[in-house]
């Protein structure tokens, strides 16, 4: 009703952008005739106009004025370099991002191209722009692909990758536009704030940031803080004993209807993801371990047992992690990708290693940490884009102060979303999924089946194999993950069946009829590999084979031989002239680059460069480009015909096999079908055994099914059921939002402390007025000593001046001649002023002694001792704050707000830490005795 009265707020926003789009389109007439050099020179003109405006605060309104011209320049450059012209809706997306909002743009609408608009405009300030993606591959792809537009216009483009050295990182962060992943940005920020010297700092001050897949980073990953840790030794036997104990304990059944707790050793709360020992469990554990108290601080066991129970019940092999090379490797619950190098903290990973009888790695201690929420709030201007943001609109607004605008699609959506089907049992559900896949496959339509775990994907694979349906399997197993983009690029071909674990998070579009461009690049790689790649470059996986009934696996092939590619992967045989062209190209490239002289990565990068449209003077890249065009041309003829057949048959059909806890992730999976106005359809198959229904309200549905005596293989389709499911999802979303909100509120306390510590550290690294800073520490320490030993309410003759003078001498041994008589008769303020003057004199004397050894040594010592104390005490403080956070939770039972308790006590602990830091620095500076330089004779 409100929307009818006031109008759609999203439509009102979009209406505001229409005149600016018209301005950009009018400018196109002036921009198009310009030569490349004239177009490039416009960047310098725009920069000069910004420079004249002065500081950043004054530049923002000027940026808004420059927007139509800047966007028009980028659109023209993109047309020339990439052969892609921004649609009007993409211009709107660019404006939404420039204004610091979230642009919701559906799959296939060209979000990557949209980011070039605000990143160019904001890079004109010279203060740097960060474009953030979810993985290294996408960061590299976008930097190479979209970076061509920026480089063409005279801007520098940087890329941050996981294995880069600090000097490379510094160089890339100094560029006008830098592409990076969220984790690399966050870890570099933490490392910069642990640097021992300013030369080790790689980032510069943050300015403007555009996040691709913003919901994945700011929502899905918001519960997990970024942590840099160091190893600490713990007793490995305890993990093993706890794992054995957990295996012997019995889980309690659900709470009885009469409220009586059923028998069992421990209870599991899947909603809270926690395990709790019952009284019987405590007794059994203490007896088995031969201890009297599991919580004994001298010999603690409770933490180990809780983690072992969670490893047993809540961390499932091939769902939450896989075992590879005798290691437990985490599987990302949102993307289905493995995350090598990542470990669960707080001893949980060690508990899983003990459960799987793997070698137990040392536990870690936090050295520095920050949540993504507080990290991205460090940017003065933040924006993001995704296909699915509206369901999380409230959280974006409340946590990040980011509004969400839905950008209309360029073409009207033609996708059909069929009603969910719910089955009584999982067995019946999976049989139905296999049957629908077979039916759609027979119609020569491509099918994409999304599963939630490796185990489920392999179950479906075996069911399809029984029906002789050829299919590709894409999950976190190492043998499947290597060729992800090849599988996805061909998932739109007629009759293709692809099973993907957590497809929602994968960045490659599915093109109906197949991706001829990718196939052409693959063919070039196959032809050139055996001639150009060095033999010792290691084994290569072979490529997916789609004509067998089993899931396409990958076997190793020697690097000296082209990978074995099934002929069915390519749409047709190449003509004789094209084959000859490729053979001649191979000979020419061997002459230019050497016989088997490249690595696989080198070859792939050169083919990728040739496949783009950027201008190049490199003769070999030009030859490669011509060859790709020839091969693509032949494939295109077949692919276009196949695309027409797939369209007529109904397009891609997407099957979801379980509702995710978040509606947004379901929408991402649905969004794979019907991109850019293509036809397509989607359906979800569910069962009462699915996690969402089981944990959040399946009893009601089960009751309905039993009441109507529904057969196992008989599905239910009803609007009431769908609404019930969406209600359950909203419950889960609210539950997780509350968790993220709590994480944010608690980390906000740490964030204020972190900022204070890091700004103090940065001042020291910059070497700004170090002596003044240390003397300031000393003066405050003198004041604290006076306040500790002098009571202003007592007469001066009762003040304990002996103790006071003794304490001053403990800190400053150079004042050993100071006596109580010298301070007798002074008032409190006079006493403080006298001691501060004594401190300054003593410090000057100390500086003279130290700098006699080597000029400038005193400044080096100041920097060293301040950083040493900050880092040591901050590390201890992080541990203490973690312990405090765990303990304040129990105070809720005493009618106290745990968050307020945490804030108050945390603040007191922080003040104590800063006081200790100042005192330790003063003590260390006066005790510092550098070794005398040795006689060189």
Swiss-Prot record:
- Asked if the record carries the keyword Thylakoid, the reply is yes
Q: What is its EC number?
A: 7.4.2.8
The entry's localization annotation reads: Cell inner membrane; Cellular thylakoid membrane; Cytoplasm
Q: Does the keyword Amino-acid biosynthesis apply?
A: no
> Where is this protein chiefly located?
membrane
GO terms under cellular component: cell envelope Sec protein transport complex; cytosol; plasma membrane-derived thylakoid membrane
Q: Which transformation does this protein catalyse, written as a reaction?
A: ATP + H2O + cellular proteinSide 1 = ADP + phosphate + cellular proteinSide 2
A family per Pfam: P-loop_SecA
Q: Which domain of life is it from?
A: Bacteria
One annotated GO molecular function = ATP binding
User: How would you describe this protein's topology in the membrane?
Assistant: Peripheral membrane protein
Q: InterPro entries under this entry?
A: Helicase_ATP-bd, P-loop_NTPase, SecA, SecA_CS, SecA_DEAD, SecA_motor_DEAD, SecA_preprotein_X-link_dom, SecA_SF2_C
Broad enzyme group? translocase
Tell me the residue numbers annotated for binding ATP. Answer: 90, 108-112, 509
Keywords for the protein's UniProt record, in alphabetical order:
ATP-binding, Cell inner membrane, Cell membrane, Cytoplasm, Membrane, Nucleotide-binding, Protein transport, Thylakoid, Translocase, Translocation, Transport
Any one GO BP annotation for this protein: intracellular protein transmembrane transport
UniProt record similarity statement? Belongs to the SecA family.
Question: What subunit structure does UniProt give?
Answer: Monomer and homodimer. Part of the essential Sec protein translocation apparatus which comprises SecA, SecYEG and auxiliary proteins SecDF. Other proteins may also be involved.
Q: Which PANTHER family match?
A: CHLOROPLAST PROTEIN-TRANSPORTING ATPASE, SECA INNER MEMBRANE COMPONENT OF SEC PROTEIN SECRETION SYSTEM
Describe the task this protein carries out: Part of the Sec protein translocase complex. Interacts with the SecYEG preprotein conducting channel. Has a central role in coupling the hydrolysis of ATP to the transfer of proteins into and across the cell membrane, serving as an ATP-driven molecular motor driving the stepwise translocation of polypeptide chains across the membrane. Probably participates in protein translocation into and across both the cytoplasmic and thylakoid membranes in cyanobacterial cells.
Q: Per its record, how is this protein called by name?
A: Protein translocase subunit SecA
The gene for this chain is secA
């Amino acid at each position: 009703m409100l929307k009818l009265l006031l109008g759609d707020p999203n439509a009102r926003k979009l209406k505001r952008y229409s005149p600016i789009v018209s301005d950009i389109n009018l400018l196109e007439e002036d921009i198009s005739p310009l030569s490349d050099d004239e177009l490039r020179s416009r960047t310098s003109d725009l920069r000069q106009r910004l420079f004249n405006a002065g500081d950043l605060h004054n530049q923002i309104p000027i940026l808004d004025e420059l927007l139509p011209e800047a966007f028009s320049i980028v659109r023209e450059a993109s047309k020339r370099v990439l052969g892609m012209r921004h649609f009007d809706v993409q211009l709107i997306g660019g404006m939404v991002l420039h204004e610091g909002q979230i642009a919701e743009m559906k799959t296939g609408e060209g979000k990557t191209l949209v980011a070039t608009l605000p990143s160019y405009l904001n890079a004109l300030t010279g203060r740097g722009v960060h474009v953030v993606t979810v993985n290294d591959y996408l960061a590299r792809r976008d930097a190479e692909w979209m970076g061509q537009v920026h480089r063409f216009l005279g801007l520098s483009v940087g890329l941050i990758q996981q294995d880069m050295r600090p000097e490379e990182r510094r160089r890339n962060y100094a560029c006008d536009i830098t592409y990076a992943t969220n984790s690399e940005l966050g870890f570099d920020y933490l490392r910069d704030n642990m640097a021992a010297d300013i030369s080790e700092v790689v980032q510069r001050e943050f300015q403007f940031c555009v996040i691709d897949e913003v919901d994945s980073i700011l929502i899905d990953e918001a519960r997990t803080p970024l942590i840099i840790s160091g190893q600490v030794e713990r007793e490995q036997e305890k993990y093993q004993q706890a794992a054995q104990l957990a295996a012997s304990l019995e889980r309690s059944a659900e709470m009885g209807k009469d409220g009586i707790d059923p028998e069992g050793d421990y209870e599991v709360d899947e909603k809270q993801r926690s395990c709790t020992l019952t009284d019987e469990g405590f007794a059994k554990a203490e007896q088995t371990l031969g201890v009297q108290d599991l919580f004994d601080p001298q010999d603690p066991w409770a933490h180990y047992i809780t983690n072992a129970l969670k490893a047993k019940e809540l961390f499932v092999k091939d769902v939450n992690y896989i075992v590879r090379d005798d290691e437990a490797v985490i599987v990302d619950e949102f993307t289905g990708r493995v995350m090598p190098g990542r470990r669960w903290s707080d001893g949980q990973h060690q508990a899983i290693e003990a459960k799987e009888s793997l070698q137990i790695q040392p536990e870690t201690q936090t050295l520095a940490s920050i949540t993504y929420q507080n990290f991205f709030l460090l940017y003065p201007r933040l924006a993001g884009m995704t296909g699915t943001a509206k369901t999380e609109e409230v959280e974006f607004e409340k946590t990040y102060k980011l509004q969400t605008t839905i950008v209309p699609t360029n073409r009207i959506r033609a996708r059909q979303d069929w009603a969910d089907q719910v089955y009584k049992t999982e067995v019946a559900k999976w049989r139905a999924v296999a049957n629908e896949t077979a039916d759609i496959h027979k119609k020569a339509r491509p099918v994409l089946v999304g599963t939630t775990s490796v185990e489920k994907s392999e179950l479906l694979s075996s069911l399809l194999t029984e029906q002789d349906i050829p299919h590709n399997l894409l999950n976190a197993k190492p043998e499947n993950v290597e060729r992800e983009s090849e599988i996805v690029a061909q998932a739109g071909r007629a009759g293709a069946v692809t099973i993907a674990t957590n497809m929602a998070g994968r960045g490659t579009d599915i093109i109906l009829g197949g991706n001829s461009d990718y196939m052409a690049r693959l063919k070039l790689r196959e032809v050139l590999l055996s001639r150009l790649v060095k033999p010792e470059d290691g084994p290569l996986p072979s490529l997916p084979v789609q004509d067998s009934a089993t899931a396409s696996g990958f076997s190793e092939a020697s690097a000296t031989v082209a990978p074995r590619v099934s002929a069915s992967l390519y749409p047709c045989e190449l003509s004789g002239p094209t084959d000859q062209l490729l053979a001649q190209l191979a000979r020419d490239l061997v002459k230019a680059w050497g016989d088997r002289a490249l690595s696989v990565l080198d070859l792939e990068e050169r083919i990728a460069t040739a496949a783009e449209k950027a201008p190049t003077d490199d003769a070999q890249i030009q030859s490669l480009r011509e060859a790709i065009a020839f091969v693509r041309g032949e494939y295109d003829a077949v692919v276009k015909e196949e695309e027409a057949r797939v369209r007529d048959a109904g397009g891609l059909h997407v099957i979801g096999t379980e509702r995710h806890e978040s509606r947004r992730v379901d929408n991402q999976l649905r969004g794979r079908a019907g991109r850019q106005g293509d036809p397509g359809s989607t359906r979800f198959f569910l069962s009462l055994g699915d996690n969402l229904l089981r944990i959040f309200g399946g009893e009601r549905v089960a009751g309905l099914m039993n009441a109507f005596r529904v057969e196992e293989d008989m599905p239910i389709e009803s609007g009431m059921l769908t609404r019930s499911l969406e209600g359950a999802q909203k419950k889960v979303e609210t539950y997780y939002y509350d968790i993220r909100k709590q994480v944010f509120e608690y980390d906000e306390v740490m964030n204020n402390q972190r900022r204070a510590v890091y700004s103090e550290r940065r001042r020291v690294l910059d070497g700004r007025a170090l002596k003044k800073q240390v003397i300031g520490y000393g003066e405050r320490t003198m004041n604290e000593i006076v306040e500790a030993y002098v009571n202003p309410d007592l007469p001066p003759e009762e003040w304990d001046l002996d103790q006071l003078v003794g304490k001053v001498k403990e800190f400053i041994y150079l004042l050993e001649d100071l006596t109580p008589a010298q301070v007798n008769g002074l008032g409190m303020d006079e006493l403080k002023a006298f001691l501060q003057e004594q401190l300054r004199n003593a410090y000057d004397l100390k500086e003279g002694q130290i700098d006699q050894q080597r000029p400038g040594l005193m400044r080096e010592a100041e920097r060293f001792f301040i950083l040493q104390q900050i880092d040591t005490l901050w590390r201890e403080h992080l541990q203490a704050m973690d312990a405090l956070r765990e303990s304040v939770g129990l105070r809720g039972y005493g009618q106290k707000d745990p968050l307020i308790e945490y804030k108050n006590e945390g603040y007191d602990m922080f003040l104590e830490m800063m006081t200790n830091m100042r005192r330790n620095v003063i003590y260390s500076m006066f005790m510092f005795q550098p070794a005398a330089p040795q006689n060189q004779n």
